[in-house]
């Protein structure tokens, strides 16, 4: 007798549910996607005990026809696909017809639904079987209640994290959906407390203000761009709002949230040296494309996708982010409102580096599974100044459009103190900003975008009434200022009518020299300096194999390495722009970079060499300068392409506005 047999439907559904329904947030995601696909304009999500006890999703979408109710909980029963070709033209968020069947096999489900001009219906499903089907009073749309999740698969409950973690994952999903569908009013309520309530205005920047707070929202920069195959639209936050993990990066394709390593890399390359090591930006990017260019049928959660013409999209994202910050004033304003806790001791640089590397290793191990506890629990919780997560607890009031006052009041992470929030002029200005935001990003008109940023950035940076915006004269991105002196032989102090400035002299010269060396390394030049006595380098056999493979790449950065017999190589000339006293050291460092990587990306090699040379040749800390030397340094910095951060992403200049200084000394209350 044969051993192979077909599994019972209930058992097969439980197995399938393990792929689709991983945790409570998976249920929320699937039901929310169904509501959006049904054309809903209002969606309410209510959870109890972080969704373990119950999840209820109510929408005003099209509803389910009475004759379809018998099929709705069957596996692979869907209205979104009809034939094979449809799989390559998917525009809906769901399409497999697996979600409801999987959910009902591991939970108790009650569904009420009603379509236009029809009577409502209610069905109750347990263990995948419809136990009750009756007429019921219902509004147009669908009301689905999921209770006792994993009641019949207790082993799954053991792997549920803390309720706080599960709520964080639910919040993450709902917030991302709200960003990608700003035209839908979405409310998330946990145990009777409102976690999120959007107004459905259609403006993504307003949703981001609700999620991240007004301080971040005011510093969002709009990006938009096209190729023959792609259109991208989104917002990128200024570098000062960077975070310690990459989960604040939100990428959508045709409204679907996705994770993609190459697109993440494109965003980071767009920011380039504006971010320090271990810091990641806040950004939202939606990519519109023909569905035939993307395969979303790769992973059960539909988070992973495969893209055609990925390199073209990569370059588009990089160029648009770079354009967004080009010629823009990015001097971060000092935050005097934050006072560290008394028992909080700053770690040494070495300790911070160790912690960062440990965190990176952990994140890299978890990235493929998308199940990192950090990944979904942290992103869209509001952070306070200590990078601690704070869950806002508003009273339950779904679908209520928040006024500008309430948006400001909710911004617990903004860093403004109570004294200033009581100032009537300040509130008036914030109201004007929000009203301006309401009218700004409806078009791609650069003038309207710049006008908004001119007004919104008044509190961000005070200089020449062009705060945080593009400067017509690039040399005026660094304001003219009077040199006052120097602190600890490291920081230059300057002032003008708008306040005080601190300039890191090492970082400033590092930026200047980096741009010089970067351009020189990229030049093809015949101007070389011959050596009377060639430099000799000795390498092991395995090192020789690598060097011989990449001799041409070394020539592209000016190093003519010749085999001299045995394990020896010589260099008899070098580019004239090499510092004479460091020729041997620079060549050694270049070769070591190649030996370390065991491969060569010529662009990265030039970048690494330029950073290395600029760091070594720059003024160090505890080096005292004369006033004219400080002035010359700032004048040179003013000529730089990106004068606000060093090549490692650290800030070069910080502004203390006159108001902030007066507040520090209690001259204003």
Swiss-Prot record:
Region described as Disordered: 356-377
Alphabetically ordered keywords of this record: DNA damage, DNA repair
Any one GO MF annotation of this record: ATP binding
Compositional bias per record (Polar residues), positions renumbered to this chain: 361-377
InterPro entries reported for this sequence: DNA_mismatch_repair_CS, DNA_mismatch_repair_MutL, DNA_mismatch_S5_2-like, HATPase_C_sf, MutL/Mlh/PMS, MutL/Mlh/Pms-like, MutL_C, MutL_C_dimsub
HAMAP family found in the cross-reference section: DNA_mis_repair (MF_00149)
Protein name: DNA mismatch repair protein MutL
Species assigned in the record: Staphylococcus aureus (strain MSSA476)
């Amino acid at each position: 007798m044969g051993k192979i047999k077909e599994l019972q439907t209930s058992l097969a559904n439980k197995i399938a549910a393990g792929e689709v329904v991983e945790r409570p947030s998976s249920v929320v995601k699937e039901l929310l996607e169904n509501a959006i696909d049904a054309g809903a304009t209002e969606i309410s999500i209510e959870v109890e005990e972080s969704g373990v006890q119950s999840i209820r999703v109510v929408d005003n979408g099209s509803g389910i026809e009475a004759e379809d109710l018998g099929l709705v909980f069957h596996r692979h029963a869907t209205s979104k696909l009809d034939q094979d070709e449809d799989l390559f033209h998917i525009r809906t968020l769901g399409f497999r017809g697996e979600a409801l069947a999987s959910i009902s096999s591991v939970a108790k489900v009650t569904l009420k639904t009603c379509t236009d001009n029809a009577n409502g219906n209610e069905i109750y499903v347990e263990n995948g079987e419809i136990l009750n089907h009756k007429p019921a009073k219902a509004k147009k749309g669908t009301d689905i209640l999921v209770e006792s999740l994993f009641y019949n698969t207790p082993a799954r409950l053991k792997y549920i994290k803390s309720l706080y973690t599960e709520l964080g994952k639910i919040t993450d999903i709902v917030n991302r959906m709200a960003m990608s569908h700003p035209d839908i009013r979405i409310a998330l309520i946990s145990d009777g407390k409102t976690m999120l309530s959007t107004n459905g205005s259609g403006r993504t920047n307003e949703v981001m203000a609700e999620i991240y707070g007004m301080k971040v929202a005011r510093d969002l920069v709009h990006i938009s761009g096209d190729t023959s195959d792609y259109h991208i639209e989104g917002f990128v936050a200024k570098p000062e709002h960077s975070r310690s993990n990459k989960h604040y990066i939100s990428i959508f394709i045709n409204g679907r949230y996705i994770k993609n390593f190459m697109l993440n890399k494109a965003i980071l390359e767009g920011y380039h040296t504006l971010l320090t090591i271990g810091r990641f930006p806040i950004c939202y990017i939606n990519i519109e494309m023909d569905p035939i260019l993307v395969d979303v049928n790769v992973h059960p959660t539909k988070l992973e996708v495969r893209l055609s013409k990925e390199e073209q999209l990569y370059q588009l994202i990089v160029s648009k982010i770079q354009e967004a910050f080009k010629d823009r004033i990015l001097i971060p304003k000092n935050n005097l409102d934050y006072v560290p806790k008394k028992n909080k001791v700053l770690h040494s640089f070495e300790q911070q580096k160790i912690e960062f590397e440990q965190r990176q290793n952990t994140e890299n191990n978890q990235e493929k599974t998308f199940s990192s506890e950090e990944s979904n629990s942290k992103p869209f919780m509001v952070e306070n100044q200590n990078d601690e997560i704070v869950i806002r607890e508003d009273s339950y009031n779904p679908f209520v459009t928040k006024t500008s006052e309430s948006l400001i009041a909710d911004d617990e992470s903004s860093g403004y103190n109570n004294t200033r929030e009581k100032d009537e002029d300040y509130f008036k200005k914030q109201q004007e900003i929000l009203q301006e935001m309401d009218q700004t990003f409806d078009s791609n008109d650069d003038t309207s975008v710049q006008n908004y940023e001119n007004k919104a950035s008044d509190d961000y940076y005070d200089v020449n009434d062009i705060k945080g915006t593009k400067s017509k004269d690039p040399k005026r991105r660094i304001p003219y200022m009077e040199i006052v002196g120097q602190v600890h032989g490291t920081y230059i102090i300057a002032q003008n009518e708008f306040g005080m400035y601190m300039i890191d002299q090492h970082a400033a010269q590092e930026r200047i020299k980096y741009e010089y060396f970067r351009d020189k390394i990229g030049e093809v030049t015949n101007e070389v300096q011959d050596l009377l006595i060639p430099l000799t380098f000795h390498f092991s056999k395995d090192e020789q194999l690598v060097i011989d493979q990449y001799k041409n790449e070394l020539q592209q950065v000016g190093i003519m390495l010749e085999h001299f017999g045995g394990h020896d190589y010589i260099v008899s000339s070098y580019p004239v722009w090499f510092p004479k006293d460091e020729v041997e050291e620079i060549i050694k460092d270049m070769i070591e970079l190649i030996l370390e990587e065991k491969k060569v990306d010529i662009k990265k090699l030039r970048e690494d060499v330029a950073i290395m040379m600029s760091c070594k040749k720059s003024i160090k800390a505890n080096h005292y300068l004369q006033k004219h030397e400080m002035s010359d340094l700032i004048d040179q910095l003013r000529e730089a392409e990106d004068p606000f951060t060093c090549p490692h992403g650290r800030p070069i200049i910080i502004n203390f506005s006159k108001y902030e200084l007066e507040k520090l000394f209690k001259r204003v209350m």
